[in-house]
Structures are given as C-alpha cells and as structure tokens.
C-alpha cells in the first residue's frame, strides 16, 4: 500500500544521494507490475540510403541471444508488420505454441506501424528508437512498451564542438 510505496521512495532517494550526491532528482515513477505475455524488441535505426529501418524480434533478455529479427524500411504497413512478425522463428510463441495463450499479434503489429510512422515522420531528428521489451499480452489485451529509448541525431553544433 501507500506505506510500502513511501518506504520504497525513501530507500531510492537515499541510495541516489549516496551514489550521486549532486544528482537532480525530480521524482520517481510508480507503475503497476505487469507479468505474463511475450517480450519483443521493436526499434529503428537510420540507414544512410534507406532512411529509417524498422526491426522487430524476440525481446527482453533473449534479444541478443537468439538474434531472431526481421527488418523493413519505414514506413511499415499493418500488413507488412504482420508479415514481419510471422517471419520470426519465435512467432510460434506468439501464436500459442505448446498450450500457451495466443498473443495479441494485432496489437504488436499496430505498435510496429506506430513506431515506423514516428521514425519516418521524425527522420531528421531521430537516429534510433529502441523499445525493449514491448510486452505483447494475451489476445485482445494489447501490447505495452515497458522500456523505451529514443536517440536523436547529433546536432551540427555538438559535432563541431568535438
């Protein structure tokens, strides 16, 4: 309850002060613990010829272990996103393999489309996007980004300063 949250906040602030006494902390984010589902990685990088390229694959701790990914230049259509997902070796996990509940593949595809459209629309400003994991919940329950990073292109002024 509230007492546990307050105690956790005090521990976080004390640890931050001990490790980085000059840090400016504007607060902490409290979010519900979400369990279950299948973790994907969804991201973009900028290719000098093709522009933003979208990547999707098995995410979380397995992203670098299995390297099961699909790539497509942005923007990606809904049909294209579904094809990317179905091309993955891990698609069986999303499709209900071995008695697992089917995942909300449509929500995952919509997330891929949204990321690809954002990357294309902001191609002049955004170098990379990394959502890992995108937690794809059971069918009909959606997908949620649990961690995300957007890396901007280096500005000309910062490049000139180097």
Model-derived features: positions:
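ATP-dependent carboxylate/acyl-activation modules
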Residues: 1-162
């Amino acid at each position: 309850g509230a007492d546990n949250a307050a105690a956790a906040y005090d521990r976080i602030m004390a640890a931050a002060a001990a490790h980085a006494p000059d840090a400016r902390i504007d607060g902490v984010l409290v979010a519900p613990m979400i369990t279950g589902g299948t973790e994907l990685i969804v991201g973009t990088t900028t290719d000098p010829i093709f522009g933003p390229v979208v990547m999707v694959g098995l995410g979380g701790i397995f992203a670098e272990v299995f390297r099961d990914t699909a790539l497509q230049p942005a923007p990606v259509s809904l049909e294209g996103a579904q094809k990317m997902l179905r091309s993955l070796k891990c698609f069986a996990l999303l499709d209900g393999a071995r008695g697992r509940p089917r995942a909300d593949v449509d929500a995952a595809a919509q997330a891929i489309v949204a990321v690809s459209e954002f990357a294309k629309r902001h191609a002049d400003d955004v170098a990379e996007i990394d959502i890992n994991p995108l937690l794809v919940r059971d069918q009909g329950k959606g997908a949620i980004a649990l961690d995300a990073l957007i890396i901007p292109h280096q500005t000309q002024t910062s490049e000139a300063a180097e």
